[in-house]
């Protein structure tokens, strides 16, 4: 096991480099004088192509969200600021995956490795922290429904944004500032050049934030069910209608949290138990679903939002469909 390759987010895994060595190529191509002495062909790891494709899709989706929020003055409420933060973080994460692919095959150096891994760590950290901030905002908007739209809430939102981006940037700077395994391979994690300790801190931090999000969503479910019951009593809804509305709201919350866990939990747990000696295919197989979370985020948090849908329609066709303008919010719209 000690000779298995490790994933290098800023360079080719060793198995791919070995596959492109001259002796391997000469076995497949007949020796013809100068051809046999030419440089080996560039061998591209299919996993890296998939990660780059995922990064491209992430950039396209989240760029649309960032442009909508930036272009629409009406989308300046705390909720939209946090959604914009999430979209910007995911946009940078997708850009980091693309840059990683370009640098890994065209411009390899220690500096590019550190800058690329720093960008990826900072952007994905900001993405996860933004998800936590959105969860906190949703909880506060329900728990303090009467005083939520106040100047105090806006100030609190800006404080959260400064803290989450400041923390994420600091985490991204750690490899650049010297906390990396470029000089000591034995300290490498499953993702080079991150150290094992660095990866462990990131994984434990994720588990802590996931536990906090789980607790907040449980409280949100309780509030949603209570609100749905009160609305049903006020409007004399049937018990079946109350049940359907509540179930829809709880199902939405379960889908949000379940998607987040399914995308990030495999890579988080694998980073805790594995090290650089493990086969790289396991790292790729757990890292790829984590990138899918940045693909799904715009669908869950942005494109499902009624106000963002209206802004998108105004930008694209200059009008708002009647189905959007007449739609009323329900307790399931969380």
Swiss-Prot record:
Compartmental location: Cell membrane
Modified sites of kind Phosphoserine: 330, 332
BP GO terms, sorted: G protein-coupled receptor signaling pathway; intracellular calcium ion homeostasis
Extracellular side: 1-48, 100-113, 180-199, 274-282
Membrane side Cytoplasmic: residue ranges: 70-78, 135-158, 221-252, 304-334
Membrane-crossing segments per the record: 49-69, 79-99, 114-134, 159-179, 200-220, 253-273, 283-303
Protein family according to the UniProt entry: Belongs to the G-protein coupled receptor 1 family.
Protein name, as recorded: G-protein coupled receptor 12
Species of origin: Mus musculus
């Amino acid at each position: 096991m000690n000779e298995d390759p490790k994933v290098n987010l800023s360079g080719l895994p060793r198995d791919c480099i070995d596959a492109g060595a001259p002796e391997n190529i000469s076995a497949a191509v007949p020796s013809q004088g100068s051809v046999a002495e030419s440089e080996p062909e560039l061998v591209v790891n299919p996993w890296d192509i998939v990660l780059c494709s995922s990064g491209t899709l992430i950039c396209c989706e989240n760029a649309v969200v960032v442009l909508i929020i930036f272009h629409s003055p009406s989308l300046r409420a705390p909720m939209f600021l946090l959604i914009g933060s999430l979209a910007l973080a995911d946009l940078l994460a997708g850009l980091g995956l693309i840059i990683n692919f370009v640098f890994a095959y065209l411009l390899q150096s220690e500096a590019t490795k550190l800058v690329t891994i720093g960008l990826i760590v900072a952007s994905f950290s900001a993405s996860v922290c933004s998800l936590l901030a959105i969860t906190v905002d949703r909880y506060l908007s329900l728990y303090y429904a009467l005083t939520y739209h106040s100047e105090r809430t806006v100030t609190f939102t800006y404080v959260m944004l400064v803290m989450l981006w400041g923390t994420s940037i600091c985490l991204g700077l750690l490899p650049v500032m010297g906390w990396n395994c470029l000089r000591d391979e034995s300290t490498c994690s499953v993702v080079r050049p991150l150290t094992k300790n660095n990866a462990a801190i990131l994984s434990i931090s994720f588990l802590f934030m996931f536990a906090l999000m789980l607790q907040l969503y449980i409280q949100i479910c309780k509030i949603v069910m209570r609100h749905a019951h009160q609305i049903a009593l006020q409007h004399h809804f049937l018990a079946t209608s109350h049940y359907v509305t509540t179930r829809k709201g709880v199902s939405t919350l379960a889908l949000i949290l379940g998607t987040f866990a399914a995308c990030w939990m495999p890579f988080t747990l694998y980073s805790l138990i594995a090290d650089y000696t493990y086969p790289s295919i396991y790292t790729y197989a757990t890292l790829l679903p984590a990138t899918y979370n940045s693909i799904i985020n715009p669908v869950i948090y942005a494109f499902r939002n009624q106000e963002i849908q209206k802004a998108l329609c105004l930008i694209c066709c200059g009008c708002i469909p009647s189905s959007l303008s007449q739609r009323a919010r329900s307790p399931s719209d969380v």
